[in-house]
């Protein structure tokens, strides 16, 4: 039994690192170079903002009843296509060529998801907590938020064997059939997707604008990424992660 538990967590250590790198880089859809220091794995950014996991019933957390695209100020410009994958980047040590600038809301979501997964599963890598699945709502919001953003083909999701790139850039909507397909394809060999109404899963939540002024300013800094053109009076959605545990 102990050996089985050790093998499970060893497998999670091996699988989670490249998957988080893939999430944060949006495959070959990142718009600027990234540092490669975090966890000592190529592709993981050294300067990533920490996502928040909030306990169920948190007064500032509420699961979305529907799945709107997460909006961020200045997010009206669609991604601009540029040359996609080349043969030279079909190597783990190579930098990924841009597929076009990601939309601000998708870039923001992926940064938060990367931080939340890192914080949530770091203790689980050492066997301190059981591995919990993803809520289907998280998958749906992920898919809806990034549906129009460019991404490389599914071959980039392979954790072993030969990897290749599609000859042209594709969007999330063209690559994945739906939200469940997205989560299964990207994280399925590490995290399963919980059944609807599951009592234990990782979910997303959005609180009303202005309810949490300090986190709001923090999120503004993340989205602005040094642009210096913040609009402090503009309403902004609050995005966070929530660990759901229902009775």
From Swiss-Prot:
<comment type="similarity">
    <text>Belongs to the folate receptor family.</text>
</comment>
<keyword id="KW-1015">Disulfide bond</keyword>
<feature type="disulfide bond">
    <location>
        <begin position="99"/>
        <end position="169"/>
    </location>
</feature>
<feature type="disulfide bond">
    <location>
        <begin position="106"/>
        <end position="146"/>
    </location>
</feature>
<comment type="function">
    <text>Riboflavin-binding protein which might have a role in retinal flavin transport.</text>
</comment>
<dbReference type="InterPro" id="IPR018143">
    <property type="entry name" value="Folate_rcpt-like"/>
</dbReference>
<dbReference type="Pfam" id="PF03024">
    <property type="entry name" value="Folate_rec"/>
</dbReference>
<keyword id="KW-0472">Membrane</keyword>
<dbReference type="GO" id="GO:0033165">
    <property type="term" value="C:interphotoreceptor matrix"/>
</dbReference>
<keyword id="KW-0732">Signal</keyword>
<dbReference type="GO" id="GO:0009897">
    <property type="term" value="C:external side of plasma membrane"/>
</dbReference>
<keyword id="KW-1003">Cell membrane</keyword>
<dbReference type="GO" id="GO:0005576">
    <property type="term" value="C:extracellular region"/>
</dbReference>
<keyword id="KW-0964">Secreted</keyword>
<keyword id="KW-0272">Extracellular matrix</keyword>
<protein>
    <recommendedName>
        <fullName>Retbindin</fullName>
    </recommendedName>
</protein>
<dbReference type="GO" id="GO:1902444">
    <property type="term" value="F:riboflavin binding"/>
</dbReference>
<feature type="disulfide bond">
    <location>
        <begin position="152"/>
        <end position="165"/>
    </location>
</feature>
<feature type="disulfide bond">
    <location>
        <begin position="139"/>
        <end position="183"/>
    </location>
</feature>
<feature type="signal peptide">
    <location>
        <begin position="1"/>
        <end position="31"/>
    </location>
</feature>
<dbReference type="InterPro" id="IPR004269">
    <property type="entry name" value="Folate_rcpt"/>
</dbReference>
